[in-house]
């Protein structure tokens, strides 16, 4: 406890093995682990809300050693300070059952550490009082409503989870960044339901940009930064709760100030004076970033930029033409989503690509794509006339 309040810390989406292990180790040691060491005697509960790992790793490679070292540091701090440690399973394709490597630690320290692999209720003594906690690790039940029914009929003091919710589940921009994918069968939790379940805050991992909803639901965001479209500050959450009333709390975001910076430079928009050396300007600008994406539509500029980027993993070159193509292509996502009938898909495609042409009805399109049903040319013409479509 701190100042008579229950103190918790939540970190998520560490993604060990995704990028530079050396850099991530430094970010953890000078950020989150320093905080844990300073607050260990005040903390009551520390939660890792999923995606501890990013990929399958070998535990004799640097990423594997970091994974072991991080847990060891947290367990030692928990023993010294007396706080509890909980680790939630994250996305299957990231964790790859590798949390099992910590089973021995969990078995030897059951009073400190629990790894949560399936939906779980737990009663904890926090601040001298029994508190009900609900954990929602990422799972893939065939019937989510039935699977969670018993758990969602109860009431809790705190909820921790990893996965999709309806405040982000239907917004492509919220989960497309940094290579995150929606796994088949992933349930999308209703935020309204979660808000009604809990007296205190609901804190989730999975979405890499931190979010707050109605002052009660939170995504921590990823601990570090991994992509150009994730510019928000990175870090972890601290929660202080009134010992007698968990509906009274303060959530504080702690920034990982060493998270790498990703900058996008639009070359064609730069106010360059005649005679200015473009490469000198770009080099100066790139000194402000750890990673830079340089975009231009000018072929001569692109040749120069590619010379600058040659052999570098920190510089990405992209043509403005490609960006325009991506914007156009996104209009046709409905084809891949496969939610419309064949006739409706064709109709929508024609309306988008030939906006000046006459609108074809579903009946006409059906006749054209189903000749085996006995429609002939006159049938199609008759339908076109009924639709008042002019035929040359």
Predicted regions: what they are:
Residues 13, 46, 51, 67, ...:
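Divalent metal-coordination and catalytic microenvironments
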Residues 86-188:
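Conserved catalytic scaffold of divalent metal-dependent phosphoesterases
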Residues 15-19, 54-57, 86-102, 122, ...:
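Active-site environment of divalent metal-dependent phosphoester hydrolases
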Residues 76-85, 197-200:
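A short helix->loop->beta-strand "cap" motif at the edges of active sites that frequently abuts
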Residues 2, 241-392:
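Accessory, non-catalytic peripheral segments of nucleic-acid enzymes
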Residues 173-245, 249:
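Conserved beta-sheet core of the metallophosphoesterase superfamily
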Residues 1-9, 121-135, 153-158, 214-217, ...:
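Beta-strand-turn-beta hairpins that frame and shape the catalytic cleft
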């Amino acid at each position: 406890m701190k100042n008579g309040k229950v103190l918790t810390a939540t970190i998520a989406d560490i993604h060990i093995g995704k990028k530079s292990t050396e850099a991530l180790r430094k970010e953890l040691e000078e950020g989150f682990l320093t905080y844990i060491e300073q607050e260990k005697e005040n903390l009551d509960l520390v939660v890792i809300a999923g995606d501890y790992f990013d990929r399958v790793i070998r535990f004799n490679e640097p990423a594997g050693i970091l994974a072991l070292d991080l847990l060891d540091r947290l367990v030692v701090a928990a023993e010294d300070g007396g706080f509890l440690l909980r680790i939630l399973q994250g996305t299957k394709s990231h964790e790859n059952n590798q949390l099992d490597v910590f089973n021995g630690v969990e078995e030897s320290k059951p009073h400190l550490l629990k790894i949560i692999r399936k939906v779980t209720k737990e009663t904890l003594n926090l601040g001298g009082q029994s508190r009900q906690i609900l954990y929602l690790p990422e799972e893939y039940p065939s019937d989510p409503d039935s699977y969670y029914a018993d758990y969602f009929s109860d009431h809790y003091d705190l909820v921790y989870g990893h996965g999709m919710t309806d405040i982000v589940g239907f917004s492509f921009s919220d989960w497309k960044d940094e290579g995150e994918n929606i796994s088949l069968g992933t349930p999308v939790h209703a935020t309204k339901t979660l808000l009604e379940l809990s007296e205190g805050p609901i804190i989730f991992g999975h979405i890499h940009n931190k979010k707050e909803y109605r002052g009660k639901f939170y995504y921590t965001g990823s601990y570090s930064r991994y992509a150009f479209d994730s510019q928000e500050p990175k870090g972890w959450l601290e929660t202080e709760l009134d010992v007698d009333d968990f509906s009274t709390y303060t959530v504080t975001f702690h920034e990982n100030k060493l998270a790498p910076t990703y900058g996008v430079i639009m070359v064609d928009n730069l106010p360059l004076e005649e005679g200015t050396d473009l490469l000198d300007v770009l080099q100066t600008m790139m000194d402000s970033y750890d990673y830079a994406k340089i975009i231009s539509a000018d072929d001569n500029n692109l040749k120069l930029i590619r010379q600058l980027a040659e052999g570098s993993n920190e510089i990405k070159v992209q043509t403005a033409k490609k960006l325009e193509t991506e914007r156009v292509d996104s209009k046709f996502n409905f084809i891949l989503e496969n939610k419309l009938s064949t006739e409706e898909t064709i109709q929508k495609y024609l309306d988008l690509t030939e906006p000046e042409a006459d609108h074809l009805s579903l009946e006409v399109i059906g006749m054209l794509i189903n000749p085996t049903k006995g429609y002939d040319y006159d049938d199609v013409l008759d339908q076109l006339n009924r639709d008042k479509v002019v035929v040359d």
